[in-house]
Amino acid sequence: MALKNINYLLIFYLSFSLLIYIKNSFCNKNNTRCLSNSCQNNSTCKDFSKDNDCSCSDTANNLDKDCDNMKDPCFSNPCQGSATCVNTPGERSFLCKCPPGYSGTICETTIGSCGKNSCQHGGICHQDPIYPVCICPAGYAGRFCEIDHDECASSPCQNGAVCQDGIDGYSCFCVPGYQGRHCDLEVDECASDPCKNEATCLNEIGRYTCICPHNYSGVNCELEIDECWSQPCLNGATCQDALGAYFCDCAPGFLGDHCELNTDECASQPCLHGGLCVDGENRYSCNCTGSGFTGTHCETLMPLCWSKPCHNNATCEDSVDNYTCHCWPGYTGAQCEIDLNECNSNPCQSNGECVELSSEKQYGRITGLPSSFSYHEASGYVCICQPGFTGIHCEEDVNECSSNPCQNGGTCENLPGNYTCHCPFDNLSRTFYGGRDCSDILLGCTHQQCLNNGTCIPHFQDGQHGFSCLCPSGYTGSLCEIATTLSFEGDGFLWVKSGSVTTKGSVCNIALRFQTVQPMALLLFRSNRDVFVKLELLSGYIHLSIQVNNQSKVLLFISHNTSDGEWHFVEVIFAEAVTLTLIDDSCKEKCIAKAPTPLESDQSICAFQNSFLGGLPVGMTSNGVALLNFYNMPSTPSFVGCLQDIKIDWNHITLENISSGSSLNVKAGCVRKDWCESQPCQSRGRCINLWLSYQCDCHRPYEGPNCLREYVAGRFGQDDSTGYVIFTLDESYGDTISLSMFVRTLQPSGLLLALENSTYQYIRVWLERGRLAMLTPNSPKLVVKFVLNDGNVHLISLKIKPYKIELYQSSQNLGFISASTWKIEKGDVIYIGGLPDKQETELNGGFFKGCIQDVRLNNQNLEFFPNPTNNASLNPVLVNVTQGCAGDNSCKSNPCHNGGVCHSRWDDFSCSCPALTSGKACEEVQWCGFSPCPHGAQCQPVLQGFECIANAVFNGQSGQILFRSNGNITRELTNITFGFRTRDANVIILHAEKEPEFLNISIQDSRLFFQLQSGNSFYMLSLTSLQSVNDGTWHEVTLSMTDPLSQTSRWQMEVDNETPFVTSTIATGSLNFLKDNTDIYVGDRAIDNIKGLQGCLSTIEIGGIYLSYFENVHGFINKPQEEQFLKISTNSVVTGCLQLNVCNSNPCLHGGNCEDIYSSYHCSCPLGWSGKHCELNIDECFSNPCIHGNCSDRVAAYHCTCEPGYTGVNCEVDIDNCQSHQCANGATCISHTNGYSCLCFGNFTGKFCRQSRLPSTVCGNEKTNLTCYNGGNCTEFQTELKCMCRPGFTGEWCEKDIDECASDPCVNGGLCQDLLNKFQCLCDVAFAGERCEVDLADDLISDIFTTIGSVTVALLLILLLAIVASVVTSNKRATQGTYSPSRQEKEGSRVEMWNLMPPPAMERLI
């Protein structure tokens, strides 16, 4: 049983071991390729084979074992036509060899001829009989020149430079430290000696390093090390830096290298007389206590002032045997013990309290004193002011209104130490305010009780609200219920009786308002037995007069017009002085006059018993008559107007308090009418309102109550008759008179006035050329500038004064003459308009024709036609003088010509002229209105006709113009006038000849030349201008006889009116020979000039007759004037010459050159501009010159704004951004479109290759050095520098990483990964091992039986060994290779791309 159990146990172990092995075998079988889905094109993968075995679904396609590629690419005959398919050995690709005439990858393109773009890169296509052939440029090859030959294939660039292939060439980009075409020249960076302060320079590749000596630092060893940086010096000493050292400058009192020792200043024992020396820092002090001495060194014997005898902080001064106290201000006494009392003079005003500054006990108690007591400031006092005052002496009143205490809009008035508020009336709320601060509402006017627009003023007194009425003018009473206005209607008065006031020093007054238009009127009269006072208007002014005992004592007046119908207030106050006051809106201030009181005795000036207002009761009572006769008073007109608010001795006067019978023509109220409102004077005079009526002050020549009548005018010279008026004076007028009259005339001459007697002519006044003239015997004649004969009415005045006679027009003084004094006597005669003696009249301007009205001698009217009711005192004698001022019928003679219509005017006529006629009588025809001249000509009116004026243009080829007189010229030809502008230096302008007479005007040697021989003269006259005239500008020329009235005369030349004129020295005749059929040539050429005049010539005038360039043109009006020069030649004349050189205005823009062609101009434009004025900017961008940029047009140029990466005028240059690159440490610069990048070399990285990858080692010296990379050890062996490389590196500088994969150590398709000094094989899924040499895919059945046999034998021998062997076998796969099937199956095969790094640059010390 036990054995059976053992057998069962053995069978169990064997079976279990077999199952484990089978499991592990299946898990390790080579089925990984099927898991990776390597079979393509819907094929099926077969497991358990060494390699893939794919069953392809389409066996006809000749696919490989993975069913993804064809074993033979030519299997499907991909080449077209008769092309031959060639299989590339070792590759699954093919190449088609095309027959002639075909091309393309599969020979699909037929080549028939050189088609478009058949040859690339500029190759030239050559037509072959079979197919075209491309002749390639240098640097390219291939059938179509499509292959760029790589010139870099031979690696021409040295020292790690980067070769850039070009077209038929190459470029080497050197790493820093090398230069030359092939980068074969090393750069010595130490050549410029960059290291300072004797430092050692190490030359490296592309850079240098400075080995600094002791005490220097910095990149170039330029910085000295500051040894004072650590602050080694003590006790305030100053550290001085030196080269490799420092020095300490000790402060006074210290010693030592670091100033650490303090000097003992007491060592010299400076203190005397037993004084104790106390040492300090750089000083000492002596303590003299108990020695009896004082001073810095205890050297001075203690003075008498030591006992402090002086009081009040006074200064004590010792002398030989005494002392003196120097007191502070405010103190006195031998020891300054007396305090002066500055308040004794009571300096503080407004009850201010005076406090002395020396009162120390008051400090801190009174706020006006300083904060603390000081003897230095104890002199003086301060004033403690009462509330409301300030200032040093309380002299300033504080403005209590500054705090705005008044409320509700009240106005604050500042008072001494106080204020008061003037409270307003609030119109919006209709509220009155009162109280000290206007804070109380006053209710007294709640129920308004004031009448007649009186103003209610509320108040609050004794707890009661009340009011008072402020009455307007004309009312009084507590409620303004009593009217005070009185109306005086003339010859009336108001008698007021009052008790006498006899107290000396009493004050009485008179006050009233009045309104009147009277200039003379009595306002008030007061009197007693010996004194009377009169207030009256004299010439509109207020007058106050006082008489005492029939003698005038006081006479006051105010020179301000009060007779203007407005209200005026006047007041008289009798006190110690008499004051007259006028209050008027037109007075800027009160009008006041004062005088001393007229009484000398104890009697009061107020002792008046009777007062009369508005007038006196003349003849009314015996008392009144006696009163007037007693004082012999001149009568003053009674007042007419209104009085109101009359107060006598402060009492209101109204009709109610006047007794019956004490007034006459006085009514209550004020009745006034504006009499002038209806304009009763008819605008012929000034209306004067007389209160009860009106009066017209008539303007001359009107008269009558309403100025309706007019003084009759006298008509002189009616229908050209001769007449005059005689006035014989019937009284004497003395030596001062005024004679005036109205005058109207259109004649320039005529006698106006003559004053004389039978033997003597006093004065004459007449018209001379329309102006007034005046003459007296033995005086010069006066002729004024004023023109009188304009047909208007003028007021002429003559004022005769002693030694002087003045002439006026209205109020304007026209002038005066000095004359002897004479008197106008009775029997003298005034003549107006003429004199009886016709011959004498003609000598004084002739008979006057016109009207004279309102003649006045002083204020007496001398009427031509007096009214019988006027009782005229002077009866005139009239000769051919009619009434009124009717004018003559001037149209009676039909004065208008050419169909004009006559209109009669006063002593004149006017004509309504037909079209194109003018003149007073339409006698002038406006020929130019008919447009008689051709285009380009200007019509110029001349006497009895017109001329066509134009500036002619001569171009040098147009030929001369011939003129000839028409035979009707009768005037004297004494001058020639013309204008021209030319640049010719020699040319003839005008030429005429009729032997022996000759005329020539030309330009010779740039100057104007004039020749003339005429009349009976045997000499030829020549004149040459002083200035050149061929400057192209206009010149105006006048050639004239200096004496045109003589048969022969010198001639003068005027050019542009510039003085001096050129005058001939000989005389010759006029130009009259041109009137006799003489040919006149204009614009001829000079003898030595093949061309004629080239320029402009204006129309020439000879004696005022034009040489017109236009003959009588068909269709135009022929010139009607008799005197003409005719154009004989038929050649047309070009007109339109410009008056000025148009080029002066600079019409050519942008620097264009202007050429004056006389009738216009021509602009020669600079580069970049075109157009008539060179105003058009030529667009240089039109041709698109910018290849890689945007074009901006400029003047005669363009500017290209290049795209990034391009430059050049036309953006044609590709920018080499590496020219100024910053690539360091031998890096290669790679240029891009917008910049560059650095290809780092060796052990460097970063944007500019300035950071090291691994530390480097430098050995050698300043001349020869070597840098080892990648941790190499630099050693010097037998004077040769070598790098001992770490395992895995090689090269001269250890710059090369040894490629351990170069020998292909990995088998069975394993991928070799190069590592540092080793390699790693990435095995295929079916292999393992360090080199993938272990095959994991043996036959599964063979493995099973071999394993079972081995296990059986082992179990039979040692059961335990079999179990161990089974466990070891099961774990075998887990320790072999580097492959993880699960990861590879999930993520696919791992591929690592290793950067191939160029060798680093060699660095060495030079």
Swiss-Prot record:
Extensively glycosylated. It comes from the Eukaryota. GO terms for biological process: blood vessel remodeling; cell-cell signaling; cellular response to light stimulus; detection of light stimulus involved in visual perception; establishment of bipolar cell polarity involved in cell morphogenesis; establishment or maintenance of cell polarity; establishment or maintenance of epithelial cell apical/basal polarity; eye photoreceptor cell development. Residues 1-25 form the signal peptide. SMART domains: EGF, EGF_CA, LamG. InterPro entries: ConA-like_dom_sf, EGF-like_Ca-bd_dom, EGF-like_CS, EGF-like_dom, EGF-type_Asp/Asn_hydroxyl_site, EGF_Ca-bd_CS, Growth_fac_rcpt_cys_sf, Laminin_G. Plays a role in photoreceptor morphogenesis in the retina. May maintain cell polarization and adhesion. This is Protein crumbs homolog 1. It comes from Homo sapiens.
